[in-house]
Regions:
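N-terminal secretory signal peptides
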Residues: 1-10, 14, 18-30
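Extracellular/periplasmic solute-recognition and catalytic clefts
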Residues: 67, 265-279, 294-361, 387, ...
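Aromatic- and charge-enriched surface segment that lines or borders ligand/interaction sites
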Residues: 110-175, 213, 304-307, 366-372, ...
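Gly/Pro-rich hinge or "lid" segments in bacterial periplasmic/extracellular proteins
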Residues: 186-191, 198-201, 207-210, 215-294, ...
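Ligand/substrate-recognition segments at binding pockets and active sites
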Residues: 269, 307, 397-398, 434-533, ...
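Detector for C-terminal structural segments
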Residues: 381-425, 478, 482-492, 516-676
Length: 676
């Protein structure tokens, strides 16, 4: 067994019944050779977990994470990394949480409302929430003041170092000004308190111990999804006083205070982390919890299947090689247990670099001229057949991974209940199309035939000195065989779709940092990257691509189009810049509509369609993987934004692995409930 799984001591807390020396395998042995003791209630507390199959549920559960995604910060207010929040969401609660349909549900806030134009939002808090230490002992009572303290911490540059400021700065009256004030003050700002924030006019107030009122700059009908993010989480002033500014910023599980469903039982970096129920959790009667939830860190994916077979994991993602192994044996019990997961919340796109450099630092004008040409870019969207590449993620149903839009489906709905990307589909003429398992939706209108576009692009580009084939540099991390295999398949997709006389994919490698070695020196032709929403509005996606905005992440750091505009475009870039200006104007027009949600989303759909028709970047895929599991994925939190998806509450589980048939029933029931 890999040395990440060697035995180690686990120290039980005083309120647990058992103690002993166990490892990932030892936990199983202590429980009779499986991942958890079975009982009629799969949770700690009065609420039973959902059970739609009559199965024997699990009281303990072992999940996994890759070692390259180990937690780096325990501070929910400070961290901006999903890998951190996947842990701390189990320990730290904010105003709202979410359910398995992605709907906001009460957490510390028991109810919330807004005024007529959605510019003022009121959150009524529970009066039974306590802060506890790692031993589950009560340290303080939580009131509305703790949310004021938390927000001041986030907005204070001397305390939180600018992390997680964008959402309050964009939405709340006075927030950006207060942040700038603290930035200008330097270290002296560390002495400011929430009272200074209120005196500065930031749009938040605690009208009593259990009522919070936020005032937005403009009507903001989606503010509840903003307030669910970590920027608005609470912290006790007493804890900050106890630890000090530096100490709280760097707090860990041993000295932080908890108000979430679990406390940390044990943490061994790059090995395991385990949570046990918070004995003073305010929601103990509202949600089900495990008696122990363990996350095992995996450095080598080749051992995952063995761990699952040994019941040292209760769930695993099934990669292409494992899937091939299972399907090659018709007698394997696992053939009937392969379950397809829901898409993860990230929309992946091919982000073109319009200002590429050669490795010697000189401009790669052959690529730069080519990618600035509209017909050349349209060949990607209308002609790149990716089914074989999708099969690297989902071998059985590869086209489930097809992504034709920029925004992730499910982020927001209009007042008619129409999901936002269906509005984009109408603008693109795809609204009558649906998944058929055979052909990519966006290639159907022309059957993937780009002969005319290819000729147009080659004629126009040859006239300005471009030579063919155009070479596209695609970087992967060195020494990773999985990444190399996927890139090799993608290279063949380029050959089959474009022809090697037109575009050739060159696979290149970096040692450790894509940002430092590739993106900063601008060596890539494109990067495939995913974006997940922080809140429920299209601006969270399309706003990353516009011009004339310092916060447009992709425009500055991936496509470099903002730098081109800042310096002044070349003649051969003027059509590209014009397309970006049109898109930017459409986004800003949509953003300005703050009193009509339907009109706002319709306007954003037109903007997104403009981006797609001009292929300013190219949507690629969704992560839709297969799993072997003892947990019903459809019972887990499934929000398209916020930090809560890895919170281990209300999970339906089974001592016996779920079957393919059961998962198909789960999916059908979920889809029916969603539509209803």
């Amino acid at each position: 067994m890999n040395n990440n799984y060697e035995s180690h001591a686990i120290s039980r807390r005083s309120f647990l019944k058992a103690s002993g020396v166990v490892g990932a395998a030892g936990i199983l042995a202590a429980c009779g050779g499986n991942s958890g003791s079975s009982s009629t209630a799969a949770s700690s507390g009065a609420t039973s977990a959902p059970n739609t199959t009559g199965a024997t549920p699990l009281k303990e559960f072992i999940s996994w994470e890759s070692t390259n995604r180990e937690l780096e910060s325990w501070n929910m207010l400070y961290s901006q990394m999903a890998s951190d929040m996947n842990v701390t969401t189990n320990l730290w609660e904010g105003l709202l949480s979410f359910d398995c349909y992605g709907k906001a549900v009460p957490s510390v806030a028991k109810e919330w409302s807004h005024n007529e134009d959605s510019s003022v939002w009121t959150f009524n808090l529970r009066d039974d929430v306590d802060w506890v230490d790692v031993n589950g002992e009560v340290k303080a009572h939580l009131t509305s003041k703790d949310f004021l303290v938390g927000l001041e911490w986030v907005l204070n540059a001397a305390k939180n170092q600018a992390n997680n400021t964008s959402m309050p700065n964009e939405t709340l009256v006075g927030a950006a000004d207060y942040y700038q004030k603290t930035s200008d003050m330097g270290d002296a700002a560390a002495d400011l308190t929430y009272e200074d924030m209120l005196a500065a006019g930031v749009g938040v107030e605690a009208t009593d111990d259990y009522t919070l009122v936020f005032t937005c700059k403009n009507p903001c009908p989606y503010f509840d999804t903003v307030a669910a993010y970590t920027s608005f989480y609470p912290v006790s002033e007493d804890l900050i006083t106890e630890l000090g500014i530096e100490g709280f910023r760097a707090c860990d599980y041993t000295n932080m205070w908890y108000n979430g469903p679990y406390v940390v039982e044990e943490f061994i970096s790059q090995n395991t982390k385990s949570y046990i129920p918070n004995p003073n959790y305010f929601g103990a009667d509202d949600v089900s919890r495990f008696d122990r939830f363990t996350v095992t860190m995996i450095s080598d994916g080749t051992v995952t299947f063995q761990l699952y077979q040994n019941r040292e994991l209760d769930e695993m993602d099934v990669g292409e090689s494992t899937l091939t192994t299972i399907q090659a044996d018709p007698n394997s019990e696992y053939n009937q247990q392969l379950c397809e997961k829901r898409p993860k919340k990230f929309s992946y796109q091919m982000h073109f670099n319009y200002q590429k450099n050669n490795e010697d630092g000189t401009p790669d004008d052959n690529w730069n001229k080519a990618i600035a040409n509209t017909a050349f870019r349209q060949c990607f969207y209308k002609g790149l057949e990716l089914t074989n590449w999708y099969a690297r993620t989902n071998k059985i149903n590869p086209l489930k991974c097809e992504n034709d839009y920029y925004t992730m489906p499910g982020v927001c709905y209009n007042t008619k209940g129409e999901e936002y990307t269906t509005l984009v589909a109408k603008e693109m003429g795809f609204d009558k199309e649906s998944y058929d398992g055979k052909t990519m939706i966006r290639l159907r209108s022309n059957n993937g035939d780009i002969a005319d576009l290819k000729k147009q692009a080659m004629d126009e580009l040859s006239a300005i000195g471009v030579t063919f084939p155009v070479h596209a540099a695609y970087y992967i991390i060195a020494g990773n065989s999985t990444a190399l295999d996927s890139a090799t398949v993608l290279k063949q997709c380029f050959t089959d779709s474009f022809g090697d006389d037109f575009i050739v994919l060159d696979i290149k490698t970096f040692v450790s940092s894509l940002t430092q070695e590739v993106r900063n020196p601008q060596l890539q032709s494109f990067v495939i990257n995913g974006w997940g929403a922080d809140f429920g509005d299209p601006i969270n996606f399309v706003g990353q691509e516009i011009l004339h905005d310092d916060n447009a992440y992709y425009s500055w750091y991936y496509s470099n189009i903002a730098k081109i505009v800042e310096a002044g475009p070349a003649d051969w870039q003027k059509d590209l810049v014009a397309a970006y200006e049109e898109f930017t104007d459409l986004v800003n027009t949509a953003k300005a509509i703050v009193d009509d949600t339907d009109a706002r989303y319709a306007a954003f759909a037109k903007a997104e369609a403009s981006m797609l028709n001009n292929v300013l970047d190219c949507p690629c895929y969704f992560e839709v993987a297969w799993t072997l599991t003892h947990a019903n994925e459809y019972s887990k939190i499934n929000a398209m934004y916020g930090p809560c998806n890895y919170k281990a509450v209300n999970w339906e589980t089974s001592e016996e692995a779920y079957t393919t048939e059961q998962y198909e029933e789960f999916a059908a029931a979920f889809d029916a409930a969603t539509q209803a």
